[in-house]
């Protein structure tokens, strides 16, 4: 009897497992892509202080990668209103400088502004908030799930921020459609129109998380008057100002003074970069590393690549470093004065990326320079062109078929699934891009090294074929072509 009961339970578990497998079956076929396209935003929502553009997350390419992409443009003296996300966005600052802040539940307000009291009995704090950070062009900002986020442009030039949202994150308990939960304002959802296409749902009238509450209830719950409740719910706005609003008179932020404005320092480096690289090869010095370390908190090195385990004294979420610069002005990981540079950031460099399970890569190529064929070992890659255009950008699927052969120009995005081989050649004086990776420790493998190994094995197995020329031809920048040919000749000679 006991054996019969155990056998029955086994069949039940097998039946349930089969049902769950059938339910997940459609998602397993989303990456059977025969053709890729360089996509541009297909939805635009204008606001008082800027606009937000989005790509369709239901597109087969984005569904394969499990991500959503958006681009926000903030005009001078404009504020991206506070919101929280059910997923963790990774934001790249394409252009501009400004401030951003996050509100972590349970963390104390450590920035306080003293003010003399009218009676002269000392000082009292009139304003306090959690830490506010300064961002600049080329920064990667990690926003943990459920954390309130805002951004402000205090400069005279627009700010352009590109955001990647991991729709397949394990922290998401809703469906795959991205949603922003705003805490203020009266505006519509950026991605909601994709969900409403083909349905007869009500028009998206906008609002925030307080709009549905009754005013009497909010007055008692928040201990505020009716005027503040109306502003909180956006009732006093004659028209929808949107998610980005103009700040009359500027925004007062309590921050420590800086010795030198970062935006001026970054702009000078970018202006001198082209001339320095053309005049002579740049020799990376310890002074450059020291300058970057001064701009970054010293606790950055505590979670370095020496150890993957926490020792109990790692940075807490309240004091975690949430942004790092990977732009042209930072020290590159790969550098060739005649070809270009590449800079990456992973959870080894920025520990906050562990919460997002995302990483990023910034690349800049000179004209006619090539990024050799390579593929991502453990991540999907979302390429977004920042400047210029690239030609001969190939992507090969598991069948060896070319799924993309064309140009990628500024403002367009291309999804490169895991293990799809890809190569790029710059057609502009400078082609720059940012690649979002769906792994906080993403790795790439260059196909050239694999070909060298295969060629060596082939020569070893067939010693008599050493006199024949190798049938492999690569397109490289002229400065490295001769070196590569020497490598191809030297490796087989070891087995002759």
From Swiss-Prot:
Hexamer; each subunit is composed of an acidic and a basic chain derived from a single precursor and linked by a disulfide bond. Residues 240-311 are annotated as: Disordered. InterPro entries: 11S_seedstore_CS, 11S_seedstore_pln, Cupin_1, RmlC-like_jellyroll, RmlC_Cupin_sf, Seed_Storage-Functional. Residues 36-230, 324-453 form the Cupin type-1 domain. The keyword Disulfide bond applies. Disulfide bonds join 31-64, 107-318. Belongs to the 11S seed storage protein (globulins) family. Seed storage protein. Alpha-amylase inhibitor. This is Legumin. Keywords: Alpha-amylase inhibitor, Disulfide bond, Seed storage protein, Signal, Storage protein. SUPFAM superfamilies: RmlC-like cupins. The keyword Disulfide bond applies. Residues 257-269 have a biased composition (Basic and acidic residues). Residues 1-21 form the signal peptide. GO terms for molecular function: alpha-amylase inhibitor activity; nutrient reservoir activity. SMART domains: Cupin_1. PROSITE patterns: 11S_SEED_STORAGE (PS00305).
């Amino acid at each position: 009897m006991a054996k019969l009961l155990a056998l029955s339970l086994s069949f039940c578990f097998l039946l349930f497992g089969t049902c769950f497998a059938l339910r997940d079956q459609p998602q397993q076929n989303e990456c059977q892509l025969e053709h890729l396209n360089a996509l541009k935003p297909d939805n635009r929502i204008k606001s008082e202080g800027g606009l937000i553009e989005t790509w369709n997350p239901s597109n087969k390419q984005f569904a394969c990668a499990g991500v959503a992409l958006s681009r926000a443009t903030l005009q001078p003296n404009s504020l991206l209103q506070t919101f929280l996300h059910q997923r963790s966005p990774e934001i790249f600052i394409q252009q501009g400088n400004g401030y951003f802040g996050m509100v972590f539940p349970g963390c104390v307000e450590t920035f306080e502004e003293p003010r003399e009291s009218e009676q002269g009995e000392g000082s009292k704090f009139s304003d306090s908030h959690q830490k506010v950070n300064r961002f600049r062009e080329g920064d990667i900002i990690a926003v943990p799930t459920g954390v309130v986020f805002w951004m402000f442009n205090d400069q005279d030039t627009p700010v352009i921020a590109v955001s990647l949202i991991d729709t397949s994150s394990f922290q998401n308990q809703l469906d795959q459609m991205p949603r922003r939960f705003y805490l203020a304002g009266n505006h519509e959802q950026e991605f909601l129109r994709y969900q409403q296409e083909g349905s007869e749902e009500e028009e998206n009238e906008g609002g925030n998380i307080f709009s549905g509450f009754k005013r009497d209830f909010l007055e008692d719950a928040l201990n505020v008057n009716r005027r503040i409740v109306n502003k909180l719910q956006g009732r006093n706005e004659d028209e929808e100002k949107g998610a980005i609003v103009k700040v009359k008179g500027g925004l007062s932020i309590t921050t420590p003074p800086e010795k030198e404005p970062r935006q001026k320092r970054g702009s000078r480096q970018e202006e001198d970069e082209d001339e320095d690289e053309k005049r002579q090869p740049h020799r990376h010095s310890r002074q450059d590393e020291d300058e970057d370390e001064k701009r970054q908190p010293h606790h950055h090195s505590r979670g370095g690549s020496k150890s993957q385990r926490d020792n109990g004294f790692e940075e807490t979420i309240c004091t975690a470093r949430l942004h790092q610069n990977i732009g042209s002005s930072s020290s590159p990981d790969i550098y060739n004065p005649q070809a270009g540079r590449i800079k990456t950031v992973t959870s080894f460099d920025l520990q906050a990326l562990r919460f997002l399970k995302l990483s990023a890569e910034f690349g800049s190529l000179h004209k006619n320079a090539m990024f050799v064929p390579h593929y991502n070992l453990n991540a999907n890659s979302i390429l977004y062109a920042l400047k210029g255009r690239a030609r001969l950008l190939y992507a090969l699927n598991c069948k060896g078929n070319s799924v993309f052969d064309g140009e990628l120009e500024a403002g367009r995005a291309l999804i490169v699934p895991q293990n799809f081989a890809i190569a790029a050649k710059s057609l502009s004086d400078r082609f720059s891009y940012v690649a979002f990776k769906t792994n906080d420790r993403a790795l790439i493998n260059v196909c050239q090294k694999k070909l060298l190994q295969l060629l060596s094995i082939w020569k070893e197995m067939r010693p008599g074929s050493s006199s024949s020329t190798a049938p492999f031809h690569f397109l490289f920048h002229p400065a490295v072509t001769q070196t590569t040919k020497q490598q191809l000749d030297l490796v087989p000679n070891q087995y002759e």
